[in-house]
């Protein structure tokens, strides 16, 4: 057996908007009018009954349960799948000034077994691209200019391979 890999993956973005505006956007997470999750390019985040403490859902093969829900501050999820992901991911809002808010996405987990390999060689790169796309979507909601983070070659290759795999199903 391999030793668990400790993962701390943090993305932050400063958005030139009051915290209340971003809290309103965070409250749309997984809803049809979602202002944050980039479901235009990635598997949608889905929860049958919406996001509330105890709700089960996820995106693609990644599954989690809502542990904390206060869209004015934090939404925290605990991983339930894939096997070997032991930990949480969360979105947090922090007021910097009256018109400037920091949004942070954090994964804090330990991986074990096959999940360690999958995190290192595939999921991490896809996750990083997805979160930056989500932050772009949020920022673009309030901007005249369109921000679009560029995917690196590895993300493009992984997405191409996954698209082929899905097409065969």
Positions of predicted regions on the chain:
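Short beta-strand segments that buttress and anchor functional surface loops
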Residues: 50-58, 76-82
């Amino acid at each position: 057996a391999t030793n668990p890999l400790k993962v701390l993956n943090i993305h932050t973005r400063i958005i030139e908007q009051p915290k209340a505006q971003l809290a309103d956007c965070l409250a749309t997470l997984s809803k049809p009018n979602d202002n944050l999750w980039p479901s235009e390019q990635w598997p949608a985040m889905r929860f049958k009954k919406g996001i509330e403490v105890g709700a089960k859902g996820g995106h693609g093969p990644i599954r989690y349960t809502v542990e904390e829900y206060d869209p004015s501050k934090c939404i925290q999820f605990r991983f339930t799948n894939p096997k070997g992901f032991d930990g949480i991911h969360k979105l947090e809002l922090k007021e910097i000034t009256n018109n400037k808010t920091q949004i942070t996405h954090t994964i804090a987990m330990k991986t074990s077994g096959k999940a360690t390999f999958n995190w290192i060689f595939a999921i991490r790169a896809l996750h990083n691209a997805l979160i930056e796309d989500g932050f772009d979507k949020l920022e673009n909601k309030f901007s005249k200019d369109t921000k679009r983070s560029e995917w690196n070659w590895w993300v493009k290759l992984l997405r191409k391979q996954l698209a082929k795999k899905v097409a065969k199903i």
